[in-house]
Amino acid sequence: MQDLGIISPGLEEFRELAAHSRVIPVRLKVLADAETPIGLYRKLAQGQPGTFLMESAAVGGAWSRYSFIGSRSRATLTTKDGQAHWLGEPPAGVPVDGNPVDAIRDTIEALRTDRFDGLPPFTSGLVGFLGWETVRHWEKLTRPPEDDLQLPELALNLVTDMAVHDNMDGTVLLIANAINFDNSSERVDEAWHDAVARVKELLARISTPVLQPVSVLEPAALDFAASVQERWNEPEYLAALDRGKEAIVDGEVFQVVISRRFEMECGASPLDVYRVLRNTNPSPYMYIFSLEDAAGRQYSIVGSSPEALVTVTGEDVITHPIAGSRPRGKTVDADKALAEELLADQKERAEHLMLVDLSRNDLSKVCVAGSVDVTQFMEVERFSHIMHLVSTVVGRLAPTAKAYDVLKATFPAGTLSGAPKPRALRLLDELEPHRRGIYGGVVGYLDFAGDMDMAIAIRSALLREGRAYVQAGGGIVADSSNPAEAQETVNKAAAPLRAVHTAGSLHNITPDSVSAPDSVSSPDSVTEANS
C-alpha cells in the first residue's frame, strides 16, 4: 500500500527508461474497493471501438486476481483484403501492409520493452483476437470456404490507456502507456507530461459517479430454441460427419473437428450479453472486445472460454489440452458418477491422449530439447455447467524463440482442428461450407515484455448489426455417433446463445418500478406472484 497515490515513474526515471524503451507504462495505484470490473468498464470504455474487458474465473467459480479494462487504443492492427491494415495511428517502423502475421511479429519487436517488476502480468502490448483464417498465413491452404461474414482475419489493439482491477487488495492501477510513436529521442519530457495528464483523466473518470443500473429478467417474448437458426442444417452437417469418417477410415486423419454456426437476433447491448454470460457461465477466460473493421463497421466479441491455447511467461511455456466432457451432475453423487464415467470412457481417453501428444509435438518446435513434459495428465476439472478432461504440457522456451514463435507453432489448437493437424486443416476446408471467423482462433494478448496469454475462441459470440453468431464443433473419430456429435455442437453453443437470448430480457428497475402483491393469502399465491 506504500505506493498508493504516487505516479510512477517520475520524470528522471522516465528519461532513463526512454533511452532504451519505446513503451513505458506511466501508472497510478488507488484504493478503489467499491469498484467492480463491470463498473470500471462502464466508466472507462462504454463499448467504444478499441476498448475491452478481460477477466478470469478460476475452477470452482472464484474470480482470479486481475481484471483488465482497456479504455483507449491509439491504433489497431487488422486486415483488409487479406493484408495488414492499421486503424488509427501506427507507430513508426512497423509494417503498414503485407502479411498480417509478419506485422504482428515486427510490431512486437519494434516496441519491445523492459519487464517491470511488481506490476500485473499485462500492462502494454497488442490485445484482441486472431481468427481461424490467420492460419492461412502459416499453412499452405489453397481452398478456403466462402467468406460470408466478411470479418477481418484479426484485430489487435495497441493498448494506450487501461485500468487493472486487483480483486485481492481492492486497488485499481491506472495506466497510460507513453508510446514513442515516431521513434525519436526528442520530446521525452513532453511524452511523460502527456501520460501523466492521461492518468489524471482516468482518475477523474473513475471518480465520477455513473449510473449503474440494477436489472431483473422479464419473461422472454420468444422461445429460446425457436429463436436460434442453424447456418448449416442438420442433414447436411451429418453428411459432412460421414465424409469425415471416411477420411479417418482411409487413414488420412485420426480425428477431425467439424463445426457449424448458429445465429439469432440480438437486440441487447454487448455489455448486457457479457453480464449474463459472466453470471451464468464463469470461465478461466472471460472477455468483451469492441472493435471495428476497415470499413468502419463496428462489432463485438463476447466470450467465456475454458481453454487456453498457450501462455508464455518469461521462459515458461504452458498449454492445457482439453478433450472429453460431461455435463455437471445435479447432485454431488451424480456429479461424481459422471466424472467416473468420463474417466472410464475409452473413446474420450484415446482422443485426449492424441491431443496431448499433439501439444507435446507443438511445444517441442520452440522449447529447449528435453524440457517438454506433461505435469498433469487427464484429470477432471469442473466448470459451472460442464466438466472436462484436462492435461498440462510445459516446456522451457528456446533461446532463439519468442512468444510469436510459440503462437505460430501451436496455432490453431489441435482440439479445434484434429490430427494430424496439416491434413485436418485441409479437410476442414473441404467439408465446412463457410469460413470460421473468430471460432477456433484465439483471444488474448502479446505484451511488449515478451509474454503472451491466448485463449481458444470457443463459447464465444460475434455480435454485429443486430445479429449474434456462435459456432461449435465436435471431434469425430471412426466410431463416433453422428447424432451424438451433432448434439454436442448444440450443447457447446448453448451458453453464449442463451446469454444473448437472456440479455434481451434484462430490464433495469428503480424503487418506483418495483411492485408487490397487495396481500398474501397462501404459499401458493407467493409462488404465483413470483413466477
From Swiss-Prot:
L-tryptophan binds at S56, P284, Y285, M286. Feedback inhibited by tryptophan. Its cofactor is Mg(2+). Residues 511-531 have a biased composition (Low complexity). Binds 1 Mg(2+) ion per subunit. Belongs to the anthranilate synthase component I family. It comes from the Bacteria. Its EC number is 4.1.3.27. This is Anthranilate synthase component 1. It comes from Arthrobacter globiformis. GO terms for biological process: L-tryptophan biosynthetic process. InterPro entries: ADC_synthase, Anth_synth_I-like, Anth_synth_I_N, Anth_synth_I_PabB, Chorismate_C. Mg(2+) binds at E351, E488. Part of a heterotetrameric complex that catalyzes the two-step biosynthesis of anthranilate, an intermediate in the biosynthesis of L-tryptophan. In the first step, the glutamine-binding beta subunit (TrpG) of anthranilate synthase (AS) provides the glutamine amidotransferase activity which generates ammonia as a substrate that, along with chorismate, is used in the second step, catalyzed by the large alpha subunit of AS (TrpE) to produce anthranilate. In the absence of TrpG, TrpE can synthesize anthranilate directly from chorismate and high concentrations of ammonia.
